[in-house]
Amino acid sequence: MNWITNYVRPRINSMLGRREVPENLWIKCPETGEMVFHKDLEGNKWVIPASGYHMKMPAKARLADLFDNGEFESLPQPKVAQDPLKFRDSKKYSDRLRDSRLKTEQEDTILAGVGKVQGLKLVAVVHEFNFIGGSLGMAAGEAIVKAFERATAEKCPLVMFPASGGARMQEGILSLMQLPRTTVAVDMLKESGQPYIVVLTNPTTGGVTASYAMLGDIHLAEPGAEIGFAGKRVIEQTLREKLPEGFQTSEYLLEHGMVDMVVKRHDIPETLARLLKILTKKPVSAANDMNSGAIALAASA
């Protein structure tokens, strides 16, 4: 009896017992409720296959997808003071930084790299939204400035992929200082004659929208991205009136002249390459003639 109780029963229980399933094994589409296996979602560039809804894409995956063969040089993360204000709300800021670093395996919200897109050298800067909402703090601001300096020094274009809730409140005025700093960095690149293209992703809001995210020579946007300064609910409460359907979406901003093109994620590398070749006066291939007219129009606008 002891043999059955002590050996056989535990073995059966272990075989039939419930196994732990990772929380992110299946991803639910916010738009349609469709459940997608996470590997299928990653393989489709974080776009829901049936609905075409663009999920937030990790910064590392974004850079690997953008550059030819996924090859690029990562720019080093600048060292800045950690938690200079000793800020605490419901949680210590230092603890938030630690947790975000464990979650994303990044030092801060910005990842930057140098590589080639269809043979054209450029610097790309990407926000990681899962790092404290992609917020702009001292480390992020310094990383952005360094990326612009690198692009200026190497005389190559810079492409920005913002995804942010705005300035990082835990750093107070030190965070707000990054708005003029990054704006000056944009001007520095433009004075050197190099193109600056912004690909607006979901969401792009707050102080990021009020600075470098809306200073590009050309603005692309992913479908359905929320783009604005204050949130829709805040504006409605302030104005005490209902805002139009689709307000602050990529498509709404395209209709009202705030962005130049809405581009699906799968088409972004090709579109960027063609735009940059036009802007830098390099030969453009005859392929994809259907898109060339729209791209040339955007470049001349």
Curated annotation (Swiss-Prot):
InterPro entries reported for this sequence: AcCoA_carboxyl_beta, Acetyl_CoA_COase_Trfase_b_su, ClpP/crotonase-like_dom_sf, COA_CT_N
GO MF entries: acetyl-CoA carboxylase activity; ATP binding; carboxyl- or carbamoyltransferase activity
Main location: cytoplasm
GO biological process, any: fatty acid biosynthetic process
EC number: 2.1.3.15
GO annotation, cellular component aspect: acetate CoA-transferase complex
Protein known as: Acetyl-coenzyme A carboxylase carboxyl transferase subunit beta
Protein's organism: Rhizobium leguminosarum bv. trifolii (strain WSM1325)
Gene: accD
